[in-house]
């Protein structure tokens, strides 16, 4: 399975820029530019990753159109901004149900990619603890279409606050 990591492309571009400027590394200012360039190459590009998560959700939605999956999933339809990480973790757990219920390798691969992308973004934000949020099992059960719509909504909340 190939995991798409578009943020690595920006790192290679920054490395090429460093090579173009290599003649200036002999000065103190050039060394500072080089060090700052290396730091910026490692910074997460969360907005781009969330866009890729939405893209994977759309792909899953397209793939399940041709199947009949009669599953209900725990869905947070009214996410409070202070509980968005907890809600995202519930959505990621429920995605595994879609993967299992479908039995389709394309859906499975897309779900795995989406989970990896989302977990990488969440881990780059540090361990955020939220209190007063609903547990996954306390959420309302909804069909897959409503689940995916709510999932896109919460991802957009992450994009708007990054």
Swiss-Prot record:
The keyword Secreted applies. Transmembrane segments: none annotated. Glycans are attached at residue 127. The keyword Flavoprotein does not apply. Gene3D superfamilies: Interleukin-15/Interleukin-21. GO terms for molecular function: cytokine activity; cytokine receptor binding. It holds the Pfam family IL15. Keywords: Cytokine, Disulfide bond, Glycoprotein, Secreted, Signal. It is found in: Secreted. Residues 30-48 form a propeptide. Residues 1-29 form the signal peptide. SUPFAM superfamilies: 4-helical cytokines. One of its GO terms (biological process) is interleukin-15-mediated signaling pathway. Belongs to the IL-15/IL-21 family. Cytokine that plays a major role in the development of inflammatory and protective immune responses to microbial invaders and parasites by modulating immune cells of both the innate and adaptive immune systems. Stimulates the proliferation of natural killer cells, T-cells and B-cells and promotes the secretion of several cytokines. In monocytes, induces the production of IL8 and monocyte chemotactic protein 1/CCL2, two chemokines that attract neutrophils and monocytes respectively to sites of infection. This is Interleukin-15. It comes from Chlorocebus aethiops (Green monkey).
């Amino acid at each position: 399975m190939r995991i798409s990591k578009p943020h690595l492309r920006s790192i290679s571009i920054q490395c090429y820029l460093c090579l173009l400027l290599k003649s200036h590394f002999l000065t103190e200012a050039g060394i500072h530019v080089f060090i700052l360039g290396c730091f910026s190459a490692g910074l997460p590009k969360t907005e781009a990753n969330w866009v890729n998560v939405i893209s994977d959700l759309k792909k899953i939605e397209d793939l399940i159109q041709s199947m009949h999956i009669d599953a209900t999933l725990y869905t947070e339809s009214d996410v409070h901004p202070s509980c968005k990480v907890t809600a995202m973790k519930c959505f990621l757990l429920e995605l595994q149900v879609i993967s299992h219920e479908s039995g389709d390798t394309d859906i499975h691969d897309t779900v795995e990619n989406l989970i990896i992308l989302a977990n990488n973004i969440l881990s780059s934000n540090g361990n955020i603890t939220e209190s007063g949020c609903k547990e996954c099992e306390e959420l309302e059960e909804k069909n897959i279409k409503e689940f995916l719509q709510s999932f896109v909504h919460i991802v957009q909340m992450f994009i708007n606050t990054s």
